[in-house]
């Protein structure tokens, strides 16, 4: 089976990709989105989102990285897709699933689910602009406020010439509510298409991964939030390994505080470590205790000292 690390805006940046791919067995990472509006973006934008471009589009441990674009105008999606791959990205992905109100308000992400023709035009333009040996992929949800158009959306992706499709098993309106996950609908899409379909949503451990694959028939999954709850989740999902012990999680957090974020104003680790602990608290009681001990700290140096001082 293949396990992909999902794009999570504001969460899974290059530093976290470096940490997670070092202790996992991911087949591919997708970057946070590059927002495309009405221009060909400067090279520095791609390097900021995906510094792995300087290293053959791979993380330090060797996992391939693919740039994701977010936008609605086929011409500019195409030009920026061409630039991304010319810079070395291992293919390019189109975001048609982000449920953020800000993103949707500007006509991007899940808003495209309302107009499958626009998905078709965007993906087709990207496919034409990218060398044929490189993948052009698309990530969608089941629909905007219902799944009534899921086949129309999936057909648009395949007819555009996309290499594969990632389907998050909820509509935009359903957000991330666990009770709404619909792996069966992903399976219906998989049966309809001839291109590979990758299942996404509520894959949080070995059992849920097995259930998802059995229900959907997919042999590849993409994991997002769960990868932060359990830092070695790809190995749990692939090999039924136990979750990472807390002392190893601490070691990972300690390494995180030592990594330098380019352009950091001093607040990067403050926000990101507190955010990560919020995910870890779902699996590790010790993370709750650590969060309480640092929640009042507002300087990176203070948080780094507190985490480095943990005895493991």
UniProtKB/Swiss-Prot annotation:
The answer to whether keyword ATP-binding applies is no
| Enzyme Commission code(s) on record | 1.3.1.-
The family database entries (Gene3D superfamilies) matched by this protein are listed as: Aldolase class I, Dihydrouridine synthase, C-terminal recognition domain
Which top-rank group of organisms is this from? Bacteria
Spell out the molecular function terms from Gene Ontology: flavin adenine dinucleotide binding; FMN binding; tRNA binding; tRNA-dihydrouridine16 synthase activity
Q: Which reaction does it catalyse?
A: 5,6-dihydrouridine(16) in tRNA + NADP(+) = uridine(16) in tRNA + NADPH + H(+); 5,6-dihydrouridine(16) in tRNA + NAD(+) = uridine(16) in tRNA + NADH + H(+)
Under InterPro entries, the record lists: Aldolase_TIM, DUS-like_FMN-bd, DUS_fam, DusC, DusC_C, tRNA_hU_synthase_CS
The record's active-site residues are: 98 (proton donor)
Positions of the record's site feature: Interacts with tRNA: 35, 95, 176, 272, 274, 279, 295
Q: What class of enzyme is it?
A: oxidoreductase
Cofactor requirements of the protein: FMN
Instruction: List positions binding FMN.
Output: 7-9, 68, 139, 200-202, 224-225
Keywords, comma-separated and alphabetical: Flavoprotein, FMN, NADP, Oxidoreductase, RNA-binding, tRNA processing, tRNA-binding
Which PANTHER family does this chain map to? TRNA-DIHYDROURIDINE SYNTHASE, TRNA-DIHYDROURIDINE(16) SYNTHASE
As for what it does, the entry says: Catalyzes the synthesis of 5,6-dihydrouridine (D), a modified base found in the D-loop of most tRNAs, via the reduction of the C5-C6 double bond in target uridines. Specifically modifies U16 in tRNAs.
The entry's family comment says: Belongs to the Dus family. DusC subfamily.
The name this protein carries in UniProt is tRNA-dihydrouridine(16) synthase
Which organism is this entry from?
A: Salmonella typhimurium (strain LT2 / SGSC1412 / ATCC 700720)
């Amino acid at each position: 089976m293949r396990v992909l690390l999902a794009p999570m805006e504001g969460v899974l940046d290059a530093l976290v990709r470096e940490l997670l791919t070092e202790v996992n067995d991911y087949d591919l990472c997708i970057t946070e989105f590059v927002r495309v509006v009405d221009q060909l973006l400067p090279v520095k934008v791609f390097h900021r989102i995906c510094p792995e471009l300087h290293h053959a589009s791979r993380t330090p441990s060797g996992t391939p990285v693919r740039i994701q674009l977010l936008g609605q105008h086929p011409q500019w999606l195409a030009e920026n897709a061409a630039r991304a791959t010319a810079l070395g990205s291992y293919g390019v992905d189109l975001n048609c699933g982000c449920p953020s109100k800000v993103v949707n308000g500007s006509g991007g992400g899940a808003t495209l689910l309302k107009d499958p023709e626009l998905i078709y035009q965007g993906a087709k333009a990207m496919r034409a602009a990218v060398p044929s040996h490189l993948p052009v992929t698309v990530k969608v949800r089941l629909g905007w406020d219902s799944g009534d158009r899921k086949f129309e959306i999936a057909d648009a992706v395949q007819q555009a010439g996309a290499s594969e499709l990632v389907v998050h098993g909820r509509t935009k309106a359903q957000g991330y509510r666990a009770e709404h996950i619909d792996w069966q609908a992903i399976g219906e899409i998989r049966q309809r298409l001839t291109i590979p379909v990758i299942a996404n949503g509520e894959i949080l451990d070995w059992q849920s991964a097995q259930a998802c694959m059995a229900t959907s028939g997919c042999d590849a999954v993409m994991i997002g939030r769960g990868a932060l709850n359990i830092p070695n989740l790809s190995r749990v999902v692939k090999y039924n390994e136990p979750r990472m012990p807390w002392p190893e999680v601490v070691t990972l957090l300690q390494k995180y505080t030592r990594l330098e974020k380019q352009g950091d104003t001093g607040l990067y680790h403050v926000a990101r470590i507190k955010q990560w602990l919020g995910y870890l608290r779902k699996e590790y009681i010790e993370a709750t205790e650590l969060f309480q001990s640092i929640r009042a700290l507002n300087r990176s140096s203070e948080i780094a000292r507190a985490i480095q001082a943990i005895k493991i």
